[in-house]
C-alpha cells in the first residue's frame, strides 16, 4: 500500500506528462516551471537520501519560481499526508528516503536495508527488517523473530568519512611544503625592495574571481572575510582580509593554522641553547620580521658592531650590555619569581668569535657586497667605541673600589661570588652566605658570562630589568613559569634530557665549597691535587678584571670551575633527594653536559693563547675536567664522550711526554700538578674500562712507584721547607698516606685492564699480605688478586682433552683456602665500607643550617687530632659503587660453594688427611656469608642511576652458558660428561669461574 502511494505521488511530481494532464488551466510557462520542479525533485531525491521526501520537494521548489510551488507540491502532500501512511520517524529517516528513491524507477523492494538492527549487528548476521505496519506487522526481522524480540535501533551509529577540516591539500608531501615555505620566506625578504604588492595581489584576486565565476555561473561571490589567512600573508605589505576575499576552493575548507603565529613558519622556536646559533634572532631581542635588509640596515649594523666587543678590546659596560642579545629575564609581577634576579640559569654556548664577525657571517649571503664597503667605517667607529669603553670602565672600577672600602656589605657580596675586583679573594676573607646563596643570571655571550662574577648584584639586576624582551622571549618566560613549581624547581616531567635546564648555581658559598671538598672528598681522591693553602692563596689569586680577552678568559674558566665543583658537592649531599633537582636523571645529564660543553668550547681560544695564559689558569682549566669525570664516577654513569674529550684535550697539551722523557725530581710545581692530573685521568679511564668493559683510552708508562713519586711528599714540621711544602698534595702526613693508598688502587685498575685474558699484556702486580692492607683500597686490591687466582685455578682444572681431575685432598685444601680467603676479604671490605660511609654521601648541614668556615675547620682538625683512625669516616670516594657492584656479583656466584666444599671434604678419604680444620674453616666462611648479606643490605651507595643488582645474577646462573665461554669455545676442548657427585660439583665450579671471567672481560656492570 505504501509503495503504491509513494509511486503514484512521485509519478505526479516527477513525470511532466502527469503534471500536464492534471493541470487544466495552466499556461505554457507554468508547465515549464512544473517540468523544472519535477527534474529538481528527482535530482534532489537521488543525491540527498538522508532528507525526507516532502522536505526535499519543498526546499527544491523554493529555489525556483514561486509560481510553481502549489502545483508541484500538491500531489506530493496528498500522497504523503494520507491517513494510511504514518509520519516517518526522525530516527528512521534514512530508510524512508531510501525507499522513496528506489520507488521512482520501479516498485521493487531493496534486497538489504541501509542499517541492521542492534541484535543482527551484535550477532553479525544479515538483517531483513522492513519498515511499515502493513508489510512487517510485528516490526522485527527474521533473526529477531526467531528469538521472539522486536528489532531495536538504539545504538548510535559512528561517524563516517574523513575527519572535519580534511582537505587533500593538507596531505601534500613534506618536500612540497618545504618549497612553499622557502618561497614564502623569499617573498617576505623582498618586502624592503618592493614598495607595494597590492596590485599583483588584486590581479591574482581578480583572476581567481573570474575562475570562480566560470565554475559557478549564476551564483554571486560569497564573502570570505571569516576565512583565516596564512601566517606568512599577514606580514606582506598591503595584504589584508579584503584583498584576499576570493581564494581557491581549498582555502574555503577548515584552516589548519588555527593558532595565530608571531613568527615565520620556516623558523623554529629557539631553545635556550640554540639562541646563540639561531639566525632568526638579532641583537636587541628583535626577530627577522623587524630586521631590514642589508641595503637599509647599514646604520644599525654599525651600531651593533660598535656595541659589541672585539677579540682584543675591553668588555662592554653595563650600558652596552643592555643592547646585548637574549636576556632571559623573569617576570617582575610574578610572586614565585621574586628572587629570580639572583638566579643564574643555563644559557647558550658563548660565541668564540667576535660578534662583529658573527654578524658578518650571518649577513654574508645577503650583503656580501655591502659589507666590503662598510669595513672601513666599522673599524673607525669600533676604535672610537673602544676608547670610550675603556674610559668608562676605569671610572666604574674606581667607584667600585671606593664602595668596597666604605661598604662592608659590598665586600660580603663580592666575597660570596669568589672574585673581588682584583680576582679570587684569599680564602681567609671568603665568608659563607646563607643557604640561599647569591646566584647571578647569565646572557649568551662570553662577556656576560665573565661579567657575572665581577659585576655587583645590584648593577646586574638593573641590566636584566632594562634588557629588551621580544615577543618570542615573553612566550618562553610564560612557558618557563608554567613548567616550574612554586619553589622554582622543575619537575621531572618538564625536564627532558635534550633541553637544558635551569640549574641554580650558588646555593653553596665559595668558602663552603672549598672547605667541604677538602674535608670529605680530597682525602680519598685528590681531584684538586694541591693542598688547601696553596689553592686559596696562590692558584685562585688570578686577575679577572675585564680589560682584555685574556682576563675575560680567566674569569670564564674560574666561573665554570666553581660551578663544576658545586655540582660535585651537591651530588654528594645526603638526605637531599626530595629537594635537590639534580637527583633527577634528565636534569643531572643536562647539568653535566652544560658544564662540559662550556669548558670545551673555549679550548680553541685556550690553545691559541696558551703561551700567554698563566700557569694557574691552565691548572684550574685541567682540574675542571677531572671534577666532571669524578662526578660521573660517583654516580656510575657511563659517558664515554666526557672521558674521551678530556683525554683528547690532555693529549693536545703534551702532558704525556713528561711520563716518558721527564725527570720528576726536577720538574716545577705546576708541572707536577699537571702530572698528577694526568695520572688521575688515567685512573678514571681504567675505572670506566673495568666497570663497563669499554676499551681503555690511555696507555701510560706506569710502575708500582708512580703513585708514590707523584703524590707522596715529605712534610717539614719545623717550617724550613715552606717552599717545597707548597706543592704537597696535603699538609698532614697521615692524610698523604691515605691519598697515596687510593692512588695506588688506580694504578692497580690500570694493570687489571692490561691483564685481561682477551689481551694479556702484563700480569697483575703482587699484593701485600692481607693483614697489612686494612684499608678499602688495599682490601679491594687483595680481593681482585685473589679473585683472579681463584678463577685461573678453576679454569685450569680440565686437561687438554677436557677430562676433570680427581678431587684429591690437596685440591680440596687448595680450593677451600682460596674460597675462605676470598670470603674473608669480601667480609672485611664490606664491613669497612659500612663503618666509613654506607651511603657514600656527605651530610653537609646536619641542622639544616650552614656551618661557618671556622667552625667546620675546627671540627675537622679536632677529629683528626683525637682519633687518626677515624679520618676517613664520612668521606666519599668515586671507587665505592664499582667496588660494591663487583663484590655483589662474586657473592651471588660463590655463596653456595662453602656448603658444597664441606660435603666434599667430609667425603674425601685419605690416610693422612685431617678434615676437621678445613670443616671449621669452611664453617666460619659460611658465617661470613651470613654477615655479608647483612652488610650488603646496609650499603646503598647508588645515586640518581639505580642499577639493578640482581640483573647480572639472573643472567649468570649456573644453567646459562657464560658469554666469554661461548667466545672461547672454539679453542677449548669440551668437558667430559660428569657422572660422580664430585665431578658434577667440579663442573659447576668451573662454570662459576667462567661467569666471574665474564665480569672481568666485559665489565662489572655487564648485563
UniProtKB/Swiss-Prot annotation:
Record field: compositional bias (Polar residues): 1-11, 42-65, 74-83, 96-105, 196-206, 274-288, 304-323, 329-339, 404-419
InterPro entries: Carb_Metab_Trans_Reg, Zn2-C6_fun-type_DNA-bd_sf, Zn2Cys6_DnaBD
Annotation: DNA-binding region: 117-151
Low complexity compositional bias, start-end: 21-33, 289-303
Subcellular localization, as worded in the UniProt entry: Nucleus; Cytoplasm
UniProt KW Methyltransferase keyword: no
Name of one Pfam family that matches: Zn_clus
Region Disordered: start-end pairs: 1-115, 155-224, 267-350, 399-423, 462-496
Statement: the UniProt record of this protein carries the keyword Zinc: yes
Basic residues: compositionally biased ranges: 473-489
Primary location: nucleus
Gene3D superfamilies attached to this UniProt entry: Zn(2)-C6 fungal-type DNA-binding domain
GO terms under cellular component: cytoplasm; nucleus
Gene Ontology MF term list: DNA binding; DNA-binding transcription factor activity, RNA polymerase II-specific; zinc ion binding
Organism domain of life: Eukaryota
CDD domains, alphabetized: GAL4
Alphabetical keyword list: Activator, Cytoplasm, DNA-binding, Metal-binding, Nucleus, Repressor, Transcription, Transcription regulation, Zinc
Protein family membership: Belongs to the EDS1/RGT1 family.
Function field: Glucose-responsive transcription factor that regulates expression of several glucose transporter (HXT) genes in response to glucose. In the absence of glucose, it functions as a transcriptional repressor, whereas high concentrations of glucose cause it to function as a transcriptional activator. In cells growing on low levels of glucose, has a neutral role, neither repressing nor activating transcription.
Alphabetized PANTHER family for the sequence: GLUCOSE TRANSPORT TRANSCRIPTION REGULATOR RGT1-RELATED (PTHR31668:SF26), GLUCOSE TRANSPORT TRANSCRIPTION REGULATOR RGT1-RELATED-RELATED (PTHR31668)
Name under which the protein is recorded: Glucose transport transcription regulator RGT1
Source organism: Kluyveromyces lactis (strain ATCC 8585 / CBS 2359 / DSM 70799 / NBRC 1267 / NRRL Y-1140 / WM37) (Yeast)
Gene: RGT1
Amino acid at each position: 500500500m505504501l509503495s503504491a502511494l509513494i509511486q503514484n505521488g512521485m509519478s505526479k511530481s516527477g513525470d511532466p506528462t502527469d503534471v500536464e494532464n492534471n493541470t487544466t488551466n495552466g499556461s505554457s510557462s507554468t508547465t515549464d516551471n512544473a517540468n523544472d520542479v519535477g527534474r529538481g525533485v528527482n535530482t534532489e531525491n537521488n543525491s540527498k537520501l538522508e532528507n525526507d521526501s516532502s522536505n526535499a520537494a519543498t526546499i527544491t521548489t523554493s529555489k525556483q519560481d514561486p509560481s510553481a510551488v502549489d502545483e508541484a507540491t500538491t500531489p506530493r502532500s496528498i500522497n504523503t499526508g494520507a491517513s494510511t501512511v504514518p509520519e516517518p520517524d526522525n530516527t528512521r529517516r534514512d530508510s524512508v528516503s531510501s525507499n522513496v528513491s528506489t520507488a521512482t524507477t520501479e516498485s521493487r523492494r531493496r534486497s538489504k536495508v541501509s542499517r541492521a538492527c542492534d541484535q543482527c549487528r551484535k550477532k553479525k548476521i544479515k538483517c531483513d527488517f522492513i519498515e511499515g505496519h502493513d508489510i512487517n506487522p510485528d516490526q522485527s526481522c527474521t533473526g529477531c523473530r526467531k528469538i521472539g524480540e522486536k528489532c531495536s535501533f538504539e545504538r548510535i551509529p559512528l561517524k563516517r568519512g574523513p575527519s572535519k577540516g580534511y582537505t587533500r591539500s593538507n596531505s601534500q608531501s613534506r618536500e612540497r611544503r618545504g618549497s612553499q615555505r622557502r618561497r614564502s620566506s623569499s617573498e617576505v625578504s623582498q618586502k624592503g625592495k618592493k614598495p607595494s604588492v597590492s596590485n599583483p595581489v588584486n590581479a591574482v584576486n581578480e583572476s581567481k574571481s573570474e575562475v570562480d565565476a566560470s565554475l559557478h555561473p549564476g551564483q554571486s561571490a560569497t564573502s570570505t572575510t571569516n576565512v583565516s589567512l596564512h601566517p606568512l600573508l599577514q606580514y606582506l605589505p598591503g595584504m589584508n582580509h579584503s584583498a584576499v576575499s576570493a581564494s581557491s576552493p581549498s582555502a574555503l575548507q577548515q584552516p589548519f593554522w588555527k593558532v595565530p603565529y608571531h613568527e615565520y613558519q620556516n623558523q623554529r622556536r629557539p631553545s635556550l641553547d640554540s639562541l646563540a646559533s639561531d639566525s632568526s634572532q638579532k641583537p636587541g631581542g628583535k626577530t627577522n620580521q623587524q630586521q631590514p635588509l642589508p641595503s637599509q640596515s647599514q646604520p644599525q649594523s654599525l651600531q651593533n658592531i660598535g656595541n659589541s666587543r672585539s677579540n682584543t678590546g675591553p668588555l662592554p659596560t653595563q650600558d652596552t650590555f643592555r643592547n646585548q642579545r637574549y636576556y632571559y629575564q623573569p617576570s617582575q609581577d610574578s610572586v614565585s619569581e621574586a628572587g629570580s634576579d639572583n638566579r643564574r640559569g643555563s644559557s647558550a654556548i658563548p660565541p668564540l668569535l667576535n660578534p662583529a664577525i658573527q654578524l658578518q657571517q650571518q649577513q654574508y649571503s645577503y650583503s656580501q657586497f655591502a659589507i666590503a664597503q662598510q669595513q672601513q667605517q666599522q673599524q673607525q667607529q669600533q676604535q672610537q667605541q673602544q676608547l670610550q669603553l675603556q674610559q668608562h670602565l676605569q671610572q666604574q672600577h674606581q667607584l667600585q673600589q671606593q664602595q668596597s672600602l666604605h661598604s662592608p656589605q659590598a665586600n660580603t657580596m663580592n666575597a660570596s661570588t669568589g672574585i673581588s675586583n682584583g680576582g679570587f679573594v684569599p680564602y681567609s676573607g671568603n665568608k659563607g652566605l646563607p643557604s640561599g646563596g647569591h646566584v647571578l643570571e647569565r646572557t649568551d655571550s662570553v662577556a656576560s658570562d665573565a661579567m657575572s662574577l665581577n659585576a655587583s648584584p645590584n648593577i646586574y639586576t638593573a641590566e636584566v630589568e632594562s634588557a629588551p624582551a621580544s615577543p618570542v622571549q615573553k612566550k618562553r618566560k610564560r612557558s618557563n613559569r608554567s613548567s616550574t613549581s612554586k619553589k622554582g624547581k622543575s619537575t621531572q616531567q618538564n625536564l627532558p634530557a635534550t633541553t637544558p635546564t635551569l640549574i641554580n648555581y650558588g646555593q653553596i658559598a665559595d668558602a663552603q665549597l672549598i672547605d667541604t671538598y677538602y674535608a670529605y672528598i680530597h682525602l680519598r681522591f685528590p681531584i684538586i691535587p694541591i693542598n688547601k693553602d696553596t689553592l686559596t692563596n696562590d692558584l685562585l689569586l688570578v686577575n679577572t678584571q675585564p680589560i682584555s680577552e685574556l682576563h675575560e678568559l680567566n674569569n670564564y674558566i674560574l666561573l665554570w670551575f666553581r660551578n663544576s665543583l658545586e655540582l660535585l658537592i651537591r651530588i654528594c649531599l645526603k638526605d637531599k633527594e626530595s629537594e635537590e633537582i639534580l637527583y633527577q636523571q634528565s636534569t643531572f645529564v643536562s647539568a653535566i653536559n652544560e658544564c662540559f660543553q662550556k669548558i670545551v668550547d673555549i679550548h680553541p681560544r685556550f690553545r691559541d693563547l696558551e703561551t700567554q695564559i698563566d700557569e694557574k689558569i691552565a691548572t684550574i682549566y685541567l682540574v675542571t675536567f677531572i671534577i666532571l669525570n669524578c662526578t660521573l664516577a660517583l654516580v656510575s654513569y657511563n659517558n664515554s664522550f666526557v672521558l674521551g674529550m678530556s683525554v683528547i684535550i690532555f693529549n693536545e697539551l703534551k702532558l704525556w711526554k713528561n711520563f716518558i722523557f721527564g725527570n720528576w725530581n726536577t720538574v716545577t710545581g705546576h708541572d707536577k700538578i699537571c702530572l698528577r692530573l694526568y695520572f688521575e685521568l688515567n685512573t678514571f679511564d681504567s675505572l670506566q674500562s673495568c666497570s663497563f668493559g669499554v676499551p681503555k683510552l690511555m696507555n701510560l708508562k706506569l710502575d708500582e712507584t708512580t703513585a708514590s713519586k707523584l703524590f707522596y711528599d715529605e712534610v717539614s714540621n719545623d717550617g724550613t721547607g715552606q717552599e717545597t711544602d707548597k706543592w704537597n698534595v696535603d699538609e698532614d702526613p697521615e692524610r698523604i698516606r691515605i691519598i697515596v693508598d687510593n692512588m695506588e688502587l688506580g694504578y692497580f685498575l690500570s694493570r687489571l685492564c692490561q691483564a685481561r685474558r682477551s689481551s694479556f699484556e702484563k700480569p697483575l702486580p703482587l699484593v701485600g699480605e692481607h693483614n697489612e692492607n686494612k684499608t678499602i683500597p688495599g682490601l679491594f686490591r687483595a680481593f681482585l688478586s685473589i679473585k683472579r687466582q681463584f678463577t685461573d685455578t678453576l679454569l685450569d682444572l680440565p686437561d687438554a682433552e677436557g677430562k676433570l681431575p680427581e678431587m684429591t685432598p690437596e685440591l680440596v685444601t687448595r680450593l677451600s683456602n682460596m674460597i675462605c680467603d676470598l670470603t674473608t676479604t669480601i667480609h672485611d671490605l664490606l664491613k669497612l665500607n659500612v663503618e666509613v660511609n654506607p651511603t657514600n654521601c656527605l651530610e653537609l648541614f646536619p641542622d639544616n643550617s650552614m656551618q661557618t668556615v671556622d667552625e667546620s675547620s675546627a671540627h675537622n682538625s679536632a677529629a683528626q687530632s683525637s682519633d687518626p683512625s677515624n679520618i676517613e669516616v664520612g668521606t666519599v670516594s668515586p671507587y665505592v659503587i664499582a667496588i660494591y657492584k663487583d663484590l655483589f656479583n662474586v657473592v651471588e656466584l660463590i655463596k653456595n660453594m662453602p656448603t658444597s666444599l664441606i660435603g666434599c671434604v667430609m667425603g674425601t678419604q685419605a690416610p693422612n688427611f685431617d678434615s676437621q680444620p678445613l670443616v671449621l674453616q669452611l664453617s666460619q666462611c659460611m658465617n661470613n656469608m651470613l654477615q655479608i648479606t647483612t652488610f650488603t643490605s646496609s650499603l646503598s651507595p647508588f645515586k640518581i642511576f639505580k642499577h639493578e643488582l640482581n640483573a647480572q645474577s639472573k643472567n649468570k646462573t649456573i644453567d646459562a652458558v657464560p658469554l666469554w665461554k661461548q667466545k672461547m669455545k672454539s679453542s677449548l676442548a669440551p668437558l667430559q660428561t660428569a657422572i660422580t657427585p664430585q665431578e658434577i660439583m667440579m663442573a659447576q665450579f668451573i662454570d662459576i669461574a667462567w661467569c666471574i671471567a665474564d665480569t672481568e672481560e666485559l665489565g662489572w656492570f655487564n648485563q
